[in-house]
UniProtKB/Swiss-Prot annotation:
Cited PANTHER family: 5-HYDROXYTRYPTAMINE RECEPTOR, MUSCARINIC ACETYLCHOLINE RECEPTOR M5
Function text: The muscarinic acetylcholine receptor mediates various cellular responses, including inhibition of adenylate cyclase, breakdown of phosphoinositides and modulation of potassium channels through the action of G proteins. Primary transducing effect is Pi turnover.
Residues spanning the membrane: 30-53, 67-87, 105-126, 147-169, 192-214, 444-464, 479-498
Origin species: Homo sapiens
Residues of this chain annotated as glycosylated in UniProt: 8
Biased composition (Polar residues): 282-291
Name of the protein described by the UniProt record: Muscarinic acetylcholine receptor M5
Cytoplasmic side: 54-66, 127-146, 215-443, 499-532
Region of interest (Disordered), residue spans: 262-294
Extracellular-facing ranges: 1-29, 88-104, 170-191, 465-478
Length: 532
């Protein structure tokens, strides 16, 4: 590809022309070209370095999909550092001034990196296609190790195809035919050979990727329709099952006699925290006895909602809380009780990690304002009885204070068996998988679209030059090949636009919040989703 543009740029009717430095451009043109290309090169380098650092510091991005994007970022970084700047220098000076060895090394690096980008896009397309069409058989084999092998093969094939031929062709034929002031691939001096490489390196891969993406799109749309039909049939019985389901879900470790309406109105309170608060309801607990000082609960189950697809991708781990029970007596070990024996309604306030700095949660015995939809989460907590005679309410019920337990926790509580509607859970899981598949397909479509837009003009000129050698001006050759480089600039932008986790990680890195722990904790408590 590149050799043909160099050939047209530095020869006239096949005869080499020696140019003086910068004689082909005016001063303002040199300044403009140098400034624009320097900015594009800088954006390319910064964008792809951000992709690599984001992958390193944020474990949420360490998915199989993103291993391929990391490989693509490596190829784009090579182009941003070496290819863009050396090619711009070559254009401005009108000749190659670094010698034949540097020329061959640069061409080998440039072609290997460019071809590796194409191969990585092919691998991503096949990975998405098999993930959609063979979810049971392919996904079991879809591991980081397998992804690493595929990435290694993509780079190895690119290296074998280009590097030996570029570096060793002159030794195979016995002489170097490229002039000293030019830089081009010796075996691409014939337009027909250049045409063949364009077909193999661009048109065939683009055709394959387009076909695969069309099939991915059709399969995704089909699954969306099937899921909509499934949700429609499930909604028929949803209203009938709602009340029993609520009663079954609202279980925890405390129980006391149901208060009257007046008592509930009197005792109603709400969760409060340093940042956010939500209403809480409950059937207050009968104290285990004046002498009981503390009791360890097996689980405290709470319910909230799945309002959107983003919530399904939030981390499943929830804060572990400590309940301080205010009553008479002092703190000391007491008896245990389990969820099967007791019943109470709780609603969890969504809190960020910073809420732990000033914990002040109050759980009231009120029983009003339940949430509309449900997401079951389990907590371990500690119940501590403190001397406070004023805290006791009617019917022996008490106010409790929720405080964070010290980390780490050895074992997370299980929430199995809490949902009484398995078909609803199955539908919800299918929706989560479908949302992730659609996000991955969107990222792939953006990358493919950018690749086709930036690489097509140059490869069209290659086809034209095969039949009409002088029909393509030198300036268009330069612009066309530079546009291929711009694809490396656009790719990180596509990742950020299509993936919220990438976008937020980029922002935090640019704001110099680069420490791994801070980045992961911030993204965790903001509920960012993983990359498909």
């Amino acid at each position: 590809m590149e050799g043909d543009s160099y050939h047209n740029a530095t020869t006239v009717n096949g005869t080499p022309v020696n140019h003086q430095p910068l004689e082909r451009h005016r001063l303002w043109e040199v300044i403009t070209i140098a400034a624009v290309t320097a900015v594009v090169s800088l954006i390319t380098i910064v964008g792809n370095v951000l992709v690599m650092i984001s992958f390193k510091v944020n474990s949420q991005l360490k998915t199989v999909n993103n291993y391929y994007l990391l490989s693509l970022a490596c190829a784009d970084l090579i182009i941003g550092i070496f290819s863009m700047n050396l090619y711009t220098t070559y254009i401005l000076m009108g000749r190659w001034a670094l010698g034949s060895l540097a020329c061959d090394l640069w061409l080998a690096l440039d072609y290997v990196a460019s071809n590796a980008s194409v191969m990585n896009l092919l691998v991503i397309s096949f990975d998405r296609y098999f993930s959609i069409t063979r979810p049971l058989t392919y996904r079991a084999k879809r591991t980081p190790k397998r992804a690493g092998i595929m990435i290694g093969l993509a780079w190895l094939i690119s290296f074998i195809l280009w590097a030996p031929a570029i570096l060793c062709w002159q030794y195979l034929v016995g002489k170097r035919t490229v002039p000293l002031d030019e830089c081009q691939i010796q075996f691409l001096s014939e337009p027909t050979i250049t045409f063949g490489t364009a077909i193999a390196a661009f048109y065939i891969p683009v055709s394959v990727m387009t076909i695969l993406y069309c099939r991915i799109y059709r399969e995704t749309e089909k699954r969306t329709k099937d899921l909509a039909d499934l949700q429609g049939s499930d909604s028929v019985t949803k209203a009938e099952k709602r009340k029993p389901a609520h009663r079954a879900l609202f279980r925890s470790c405390l129980r006391c006699p149901r208060p009257t309406l007046a008592q509930r109105e009197r005792n109603q309170a709400s969760w409060s925290s340093s940042r956010r608060s939500t209403s809480t309801t409950g059937k207050p607990s009968q104290a285990t006895g004046p002498s009981a000082n503390w009791a360890k609960a097996e689980q405290l189950t709470t319910c909230s909602s799945y309002p959107s697809s983003e919530d399904e991708d939030k981390p499943a781990t929830d804060p572990v809380l400590q309940v301080v029970y205010k009553s008479q007596g002092k703190e000391s070990p007491g008896e245990e009780f389990s969820a099967e024996e007791t019943e109470e309604t709780f609603v969890k306030a969504e809190t960020e990690k910073s809420d732990y700095d000033t914990p002040n949660y109050l759980l009231s015995p009120a029983a009003a304002h339940r949430p509309k939809s449900q997401k079951c989460v389990a907590y371990k907590f500690r119940l501590v009885v403190k001397a406070d005679g004023n805290q006791e309410t009617n019917n022996g019920c008490h106010k409790v204070k929720i405080m964070p337990c010290p980390f780490p926790v050895a074992k997370e509580p299980s929430t199995k068996g809490l949902n009484p509607n398995p078909s609803h859970q199955m539908t919800k899981r299918k929706r989560v998988v479908l949302v992730k598949e659609r996000k991955a397909a969107q990222t792939l479509s953006a990358i493919l679209l950018a690749f086709i837009i930036t690489w097509t003009p140059y490869n069209i000129m290659v086809l034209v030059s095969t039949f009409c050698d002088k029909c393509v001006p030198v300036t268009l050759w330069h612009l066309g090949y530079w546009l291929c480089y711009v694809n490396s600039t656009v790719n990180p932008i596509c990742y950020a636009l299509c993936n919220r986790t990438f976008r937020k990680t980029f922002k935090m890195l640019l704001l110099c919040r680069w420490k791994k722990k801070k980045v992961e904790e911030k993204l965790y408590w903001q509920g960012n989703s993983k990359l498909p």
